[in-house]
Amino acid sequence: MPYATEETSSVAWFPEGNLCHSKTCGPRTNGIVLEAMKGKLSQPSEWDRSEPFCVMDLGYVYNEYQRWTSLLPDVKPFYAVKCNPDTHIIKVLNAMNSGFDCASRNEMELVMSQGVAPERIIFANPCKKISDLEYAQQSGVRKMTFDNEAELQKIRQRFPDAQLILRCLASDPSATYSLGSKFGASSATSVKLLQCAKSWGLSVVGVSFHIGSNAKDPTAFDKAIQNSREVFDAGLRTGHDMHLLDIGGGFSAHNFDAMASSIRQCIGKYFCGIDVEIVAEPGRYFAAGALTLACGIIGRRDAAANDEDKENRHMLYLNDGVYGTFICNIFEPGPQPKVLRASGDFYPLDSEDEYERYTIWGPTCDGTDCVAESVALPKSLAIDDWLYFPEMGAYSTCLSTGFNGFHSDRETIYMSSDPAADIYL
């Protein structure tokens, strides 16, 4: 692929911003992603220009794994497949000996179809379907989480030789998506569950927690890891062979240096001298920055100068929306869009074009299908121009629906900003 070469790192039309927030990535990531989009739009009639498309940089995934092992060398990542089940991501991480966090039979089947051994899978769903539990037993996926007695009973009946990981209650109030109200046993409940498991002859091998997705407070790990040590010791006293600590997910590439520093300190503080295997379940950390989404402008609406609605004077309508790739925009602001002209040219930095504020809508007939409000973009934007959105790889394409008859599939162009990952194209 021409845009997956070293030469593209020197292109002169980089727009402002960098799609890669990893310290191990450079301008080449920016260049080849933009080259891929430009090349796509320059194709006259080989594809349906009415549909959005994506560009995935596998070099980003590769480099973020290197960054992880540099900052947290004693914590093995188990990629959260739910975040983005793209097989290319799975292939890269599998080749780097990553583990995988799966929540269902389908996810386990997917990663094992890519050559992942069952020993490198954690069935990290505290409340599992019986059929999925039976599939795990048949496939040899022994490590799994639980947080209640009913789940223990289910496992006792169908997979008594499983290696159990007790999910403890933890929370970061600053996280975008909290999980504490749905999963996690309190300290008192954890002790009772350890005793129950022992009396039933079940083997608890470790403790896990999840402070929430897209966590922002590095200090939230201190209390969670301290509590994990207390439950870990309770398991040892009960007679379990405790040897695993799972610190969950929620990591963002943006603040990972601070997060990693806090985690290293907490592990040294609470698990110093303990023979323990430490794992984590990062998802968006690997996937978010790997994907850029390009959307076409299919409509523009401008109110009359005397219109009383000052807030919605200028509107753009895209061929993707919150029922598609932008579903997370319902819960948090999405990335700032950048401009790609219908000709395939990027909007120049030195443009003297006037800007105005737009409301950006998705293509459906639902009034809540709003991608963004009050976004400053060039006044000259027109139908058939394109906007592109960086960092769209997490919880986006995998959640896309076919509501209103719009396609849920997104064509994806694969490339690599690092030659070491070119073999996965």
UniProtKB/Swiss-Prot annotation:
The gene is flvG. This is Decarboxylase flvG. InterPro entries: Ala_racemase/Decarboxylase_C, De-COase2_C, De-COase2_N, Orn/DAP/Arg_de-COase, Orn_de-COase, PLP-binding_barrel. PANTHER family: ARGININE/DIAMINOPIMELATE/ORNITHINE DECARBOXYLASE, ORNITHINE DECARBOXYLASE 1-RELATED. It is found in: Cytoplasm. The lineage of its organism: Eukaryota, Fungi, Dikarya, Ascomycota, Pezizomycotina. It comes from Aspergillus flavus (strain ATCC 200026 / FGSC A1120 / IAM 13836 / NRRL 3357 / JCM 12722 / SRRC 167). Pyridoxal 5'-phosphate binds at residues 213, 250, 281-284, 395. Keywords: Cytoplasm, Decarboxylase, Lyase, Pyridoxal phosphate. Homodimer. Only the dimer is catalytically active, as the active sites are constructed of residues from both monomers. Substrate binds at residues 331-332, 366. Its main location: cytoplasm. The active site is at residue 365.
